[in-house]
Amino acid sequence: MMCGAPSATQPATAETQHIADQVRSQLEEKENKKFPVFKAVSFKSQVVAGTNYFIKVHVGDEDFVHLRVFQSLPHENKPLTLSNYQTNKAKHDELTYF
């Protein structure tokens, strides 16, 4: 992967689900709601001064959210951060930089 360029969209992995799970409470607090389902479906990653993960998450029924999660460099020892998110997404909506 080239530094700065997002990767191609890939199916979510166990690691992707783990990342999404770690920021779930941040999203639920910002949206003031609990999601009955929180299943990572696909993702892109972008290497910057750390890594941005763009994750499509199924949150119930036909509803999806897109998350941008920042993981700092390992030596910084910082928690994952929900940098941004988009609600009202559908299964067919493409993951793009936001």
UniProtKB/Swiss-Prot annotation:
Q: Which InterPro entries match?
A: Cystatin_dom, Cystatin_sf, Prot_inh_cystat_CS, Prot_inh_stefin
Residue numbers of N-acetylmethionine PTMs: 1
Q: What is its main location?
A: cytoplasm
Coiled coil regions, renumbered to chain? none
Could you list this entry's UniProt keywords, alphabetically sorted.
Acetylation, Cytoplasm, Disease variant, Epilepsy, Neurodegeneration, Nucleus, Protease inhibitor, Thiol protease inhibitor
What are the record's GO terms for cellular component? collagen-containing extracellular matrix; cytoplasm; cytosol; extracellular exosome; extracellular region; extracellular space; ficolin-1-rich granule lumen; nucleolus
Q: Where is this site: Reactive site?
A: 4
Specify whether Cytoplasm is a keyword of the entry: yes
UniProt GO BP:
adult locomotory behavior; negative regulation of proteolysis
- Return the Pfam families for the record: Cystatin (PF00031)
Give the domain of life.
Eukaryota
Q: Which CDD domains match?
A: CY
Q: Where is this motif: Secondary area of contact?
A: 46-50
Compartmental location:
Cytoplasm; Nucleus
What family does the database annotate?
Answer: Belongs to the cystatin family.
What binding partners and quaternary form does the record give?
A: Able to form dimers stabilized by noncovalent forces.
What is the disease in the record?
Epilepsy, progressive myoclonic 1: A form of progressive myoclonic epilepsy, a clinically and genetically heterogeneous group of disorders defined by the combination of action and reflex myoclonus, other types of epileptic seizures, and progressive neurodegeneration and neurocognitive impairment. EPM1 is an autosomal recessive form characterized by severe, stimulus-sensitive myoclonus and tonic-clonic seizures. The onset, occurring between 6 and 13 years of age, is characterized by convulsions. Myoclonus begins 1 to 5 years later.
Q: Can you name this protein?
A: Cystatin-B
User: In which organism is this protein found?
Assistant: Homo sapiens (Human)
Upper lineage is: Eukaryota, Metazoa, Chordata, Craniata, Vertebrata
